[in-house]
């Protein structure tokens, strides 16, 4: 699978909380978050790496230009209004094939990255069009809830569903899902959650793989929580 990291957001809540560096450069487990994700994707086995990075953050581009990873790395600069738009922008330059995609603010344990990557590859090979990483751990101010039957996603909702299960910002995309994302933006769909809802409503095969905990780094407190969580595991 090709690897894609979406880093097109402004990171306004981090900045408002006093974090001076762009979100992709915040330190998680002792290294810039975007570097950690690229190293993780390399370890997982991605055949290529693409980062869609906000054009307002030249420091991120400079950092990546000075780094070398195993697979070839392409940096796409963008100024997009939503993560769905950033996804569509990033997909445009990726060769044919399935894509393993993460938001830049997603934090998981190494073993959970391996579980999600492995399941995404299997489920896509077995006919799923889109695979979502999900978790019962809710730390988002506006979570996207998922209802499942086995591995299959039956509903995507803004309202809580039982048992509690929310998306975590990590996706496996087939060729069909790649095309659907680009088409959705062309049709005026504005948010990632609206895209996910539409795929399920259309009867597309959307699968989920659950892990115990996923942290989204939106606020300074999230950054502290993520670093404390990962540090505790290493003791």
Can you say where each PLM-predicted feature lies in the sequence?
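A short, N-terminal amphipathic alpha-helix
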Residues: 31-48
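A conserved acidic beta->alpha catalytic loop
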Residues: 56-58
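Residues at the starts of beta-strands that form the adenosine-phosphate
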Residues: 2, 47-49, 72, 98, ...
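N-terminal nucleotide-binding beta1-loop-alpha1 segment
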Residues: 1-19
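Catalytic-core segments of class I nucleotidyltransferases/pyrophosphorylases
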Residues: 114, 124, 152-235
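Conserved beta-loop-beta/alpha segment of the NTase-like Rossmann-fold superfamily
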Residues: 60-61, 68-145
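Short internal beta-strands
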Residues: 50-54, 132-134
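Short catalytic helix/loop segments, enriched in acidic residues and glycine
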Residues: 20-35
């Amino acid at each position: 699978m090709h690897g894609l990291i979406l880093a097109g957001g402004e990171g306004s809540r981090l900045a408002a909380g006093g974090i001076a560096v762009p979100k992709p450069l915040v330190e998680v487990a002792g290294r810039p978050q975007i570097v950690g994700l690229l190293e993780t994707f390399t370890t997982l086995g991605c055949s290529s790496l693409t980062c869609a990075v906000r054009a307002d953050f030249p420091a991120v581009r400079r950092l990546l230009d000075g780094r070398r990873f195993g697979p070839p790395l392409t940096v796409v600069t963008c100024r997009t209004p939503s993560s769905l738009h950033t996804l569509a922008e990033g997909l445009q330059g990726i060769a044919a094939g399935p894509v393993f995609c993460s938001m830049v603010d997603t934090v998981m344990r190494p073993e959970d990255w391996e579980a999600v990557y492995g399941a995404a590859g299997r489920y896509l090979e077995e006919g799923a069009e889109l695979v979502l990483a999900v978790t019962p751990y809710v730390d988002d101010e506006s979570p996207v809830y998922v209802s499942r039957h086995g591995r299959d996603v039956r509903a995507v909702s803004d309202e809580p569903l039982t048992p509690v299960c929310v998306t975590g910002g990590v996706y496996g995309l087939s060729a069909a899902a790649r095309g659907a994302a680009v088409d959705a933006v062309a049709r005026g769909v504005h948010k990632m959650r609206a895209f996910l809802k539409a795929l399920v409503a259309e009867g597309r095969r959307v699968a989920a793989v659950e892990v115990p905990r996923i942290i989204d780094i939106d606020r300074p407190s999230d950054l502290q929580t993520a670093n404390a969580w990962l540090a505790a595991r290493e003791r």
